[in-house]
């Protein structure tokens, strides 16, 4: 028997017991010839003591950190002065026998050391020994268990869908898998189980879910991975309200399993409201700074830049904040909004009851009226911008408010703000392809399909938590004629629609129920619960921002024989552009 107890289990009630523990040597101290070893496993730590007269003393002299050992001994109460408030802090084990299970070389770092993320990812098995990383994966497990408990209780079936499927791009690039048996043909790893879960609804499985692995070949950010986990959910015979109400309860239940209480009722705003007020379709409302339309305050101005914008149908918008402002800071913020296509940034502040601004000479009257109408107080700063494209203006100011919040508001770690964003545009214009594309995906039910393309709204909904989209879903199209019309609107010919989605169009002919669903980004849900800066901290073996695995070296080259078997030739992949066939 390797152990009778874990290293986080023993307490004062176990004093006098003979026990066997196994784990990693976390730390070693030598006090007056007595060896104090902190033994660690994923459950906790236990102090074990090797006295000079112990038969195990000689071997204890040779043990190093991160060795894996087994000890046998007797549980003893610690002296009062050495007790701690940890789980095993009242006891220690007096060692009678030590068995070395595995030696450890000097590691590149010890658990808990502050080292670069690249090094952590290269030696991820060492990194995961850290108590914080250990906690992250335990919390992830608890949230996954809670999700399954809730869905099982509400009659959902967990059903797996294929990983090797047909390439039907949904916005990002597919990861392609060559077929050895079907020369020249490829599978695609699924970006989501979207079409299969709809086919399950057609099959009569009215409540489905799975923890789906999804794959998207896209540029990565802190909250993106090329492979990720989503909780995929679909229901038949539901309207949008049914999905929203049940999924609110679902998310509350999952977060409550790790001690987080979410609001009893999630607010709901439209996409248009989100963009107008927060400059984002995933608004973070924890710090105010709502965007205000200030155009009317400048309609009589002679200030050329502002006047030209207004005369060309543009807008002036801004928000109130309480950050320290100076010409240097303002210049940095102006450079930032220029990255989003704005020409510049105006600002003024109220200081000792007076307006202070570099443009006070030209716009002081407008600033005074804004100050009065919005009841500004000393220290308030108003940041403003003007542009003829209102959407671009909203987006730039939305990004600016997020930057300011991140840099200046330290209390964002407190509390959780949850809401739904609804009434999304069904389509968006793709300038590169010169056509409309589906904003979510082309299987979403449109509200007013006969309207102008830019006016069509979707039965789509996103769940937002602390400014992060944790879930997105929609009511689906269950009528083949409507589905064909949507394909036509986004520029697919009948032939292209049949080639890409013929199996779906065929299925919709044979009695498809009204259905809808949602998918939750599970990695992101866990990351928010733990307030980590990156979802990499809640994934056991993540990829880097360049999509590589530091641990295994993936992606890697393969043998020429493997490529020949797949009838694949590679060109221009060596350094210097040398051809490799």
UniProtKB/Swiss-Prot annotation:
UniProt-annotated stretches for the region Aspartate: 194-197
Keywords of the record: Aminoacyl-tRNA synthetase, ATP-binding, Cytoplasm, Ligase, Nucleotide-binding, Protein biosynthesis
EC nos: 6.1.1.12
GO MF terms, alphabetically ordered: aspartate-tRNA ligase activity; ATP binding; nucleic acid binding
InterPro entries xref list: Aa-tRNA-synt_II (IPR004364), aa-tRNA-synth_II (IPR006195), aa-tRNA-synth_II/BPL/LPL (IPR045864), Asp-tRNA-ligase_1 (IPR004524), Asp-tRNA-ligase_1_N (IPR047089), Asp/Asn-tRNA-synth_IIb (IPR002312), AspRS_core (IPR047090), GAD-like_sf (IPR004115)
Swiss-Prot/TrEMBL catalytic activity: tRNA(Asp) + L-aspartate + ATP = L-aspartyl-tRNA(Asp) + AMP + diphosphate
Matching Pfam families: GAD, tRNA-synt_2, tRNA_anti-codon
Residues given in the record as L-aspartate binding sites: 170, 216, 440, 476
Coiled-coil regions, chain positions: none
Major localisation: cytoplasm
The keyword ATP-binding belongs to this UniProt entry's keyword annotation: yes
Localization in the cell: Cytoplasm
One BP term from GO: aspartyl-tRNA aminoacylation
Gene Ontology terms: cellular component: cytoplasm
EC main group: ligase
Functional description taken from the UniProt entry: Catalyzes the attachment of L-aspartate to tRNA(Asp) in a two-step reaction: L-aspartate is first activated by ATP to form Asp-AMP and then transferred to the acceptor end of tRNA(Asp).
Subunit note: Homodimer.
Family: Belongs to the class-II aminoacyl-tRNA synthetase family. Type 1 subfamily.
PANTHER family, alphabetized: ASPARTATE--TRNA LIGASE, MITOCHONDRIAL (PTHR22594:SF5), ASPARTYL/LYSYL-TRNA SYNTHETASE (PTHR22594)
Protein name: Aspartate--tRNA ligase
Organism this protein belongs to: Thermosipho africanus (strain TCF52B)
Lineage: Bacteria, Thermotogati, Thermotogota, Thermotogae, Thermotogales
